[in-house]
Amino acid sequence: GGCRDSKPSGNASIRSMSDAVLPSPPITYAPLSYESRLARRALTQIDMVVIHCTELPDMAMAREYGERVLYDSGTGNSGHYYLDRNGSIQQYVALERVAHHVRGHNPHTLGIELVNRGRYPHWLDSRYQQMTEPYPEAQIAALITLLQWLQQQLPSVRRIAGHQALDTTQEAASDDPARKIRRKLDPGPLFPWPRIEAAVSWSHTPR
């Protein structure tokens, strides 16, 4: 289906009663073709935000990967929100749906993906494990705005974590099967955790 601009569905019923209600950031709701096949959940189940980077060159390729069907259920892997380098935000999956973005934690988390090359295209090559692309100021500013709004909308959230802190599995290196490589390193060493920790009241799961 086509993209349309809207606030994420379901937020009206969980608005904070605080006088200082934060406006919704500008979010383009662009649901994945299989969104309706993802499991439903109550918003109160969400207790953690997980920060990822796409490890892909651009938003178009992130969309292509998100649309890939990988499971018998007719669904694939994606985050809920995607932030481009210029700070624009797209929502691929409604918060009431369980996105497949982090092993073992999907039912109770929401995933935020930042467009960043990461180790692309040598994800599991032991010679290319440095993540060298910085996160632009516009992207981080948009992330902080989104996180502060989500903090107001989802009082059940108590924690924030990087993908690499939750998925610590290793795989054989593509260039040398005798070596083991971390599957996930995102968002990586260039992600400004101190700024994020200062912007929200959630506890940060150790890196």
Locate predicted features.
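Basic/polar, cationic surfaces and motifs that engage anionic cell-wall
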Residues: 18-25, 43, 121-207
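Soluble periplasmic/extracytoplasmic beta-strand elements of cell-envelope proteins
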Residues: 50, 111-113, 161
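N-terminal catalytic cores of peptidoglycan-degrading enzymes
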Residues: 3, 10-102
